From Swiss-Prot:
Gene3D superfamilies: 6.10.160.10, Ribosomal protein L20. Keywords: Ribonucleoprotein, Ribosomal protein, RNA-binding, rRNA-binding. GO terms for biological process: ribosomal large subunit assembly; translation. This is Large ribosomal subunit protein bL20. One of its GO terms (cellular component) is ribosome. It comes from Bifidobacterium longum (strain DJO10A). It holds the Pfam family Ribosomal_L20. GO terms for molecular function: rRNA binding; structural constituent of ribosome. Binds directly to 23S ribosomal RNA and is necessary for the in vitro assembly process of the 50S ribosomal subunit. It is not involved in the protein synthesizing functions of that subunit. Belongs to the bacterial ribosomal protein bL20 family. PANTHER family: 39S RIBOSOMAL PROTEIN L20 (PTHR10986). SUPFAM superfamilies: Ribosomal protein L20.
Length: 127
């Protein structure tokens, strides 16, 4: 049987790793072992942060909605309660977009939520 020489495959593997690590700082972009270790960490960070991004956007939407409803004289949690009681089923992403891009429509939604709320804050809620 013929001997298998692996130089081409080994060089290709190293070249691919170094190309993927090209934007890293210092030895992590120039030395194969350091680049490979950094890539493994980067993949883990990427996986973790793809999951965290969903929560980050939800927090951002809630902050935007909270700022917009406070300008209308109501708190965020009372607004969400009013939406539920009024039967308005808009998610936070849509509400935040409406609050930023179309304040008049958002004011209409806030008024509908306020109207659905009971006058007494401590009154039992019938859902």
């Amino acid at each position: 049987m013929a001997r298998v020489k692996r130089a081409v495959n080994a060089h290709k593997k190293r070249r691919v790793v170094l190309e993927r690590a090209s934007g890293y700082r210092g030895q992590r972009s120039r030395l194969y072992r350091k680049a490979k270790e950094q890539l493994l960490h980067s993949f883990n960070y990427n996986f973790r942060d793809r999951k965290a991004r969903k929560g980050d956007f939800r927090k951002l939407w809630i902050q935007r909605i909270n700022a917009a409803v406070r300008a209308e004289g109501i708190t965020y949690n009372r607004f969400i309660q009013g939406l539920r009681l009024a039967g308005i089923e808009l998610d936070r992403r849509a509400l935040a977009e409406i609050a930023v891009s179309d304040p008049d429509t958002f004011k209409t939604i806030v008024d509908a939520a306020k109207a659905a709320l009971p006058e007494d804050v401590n009154a039992p809620v019938e859902a």
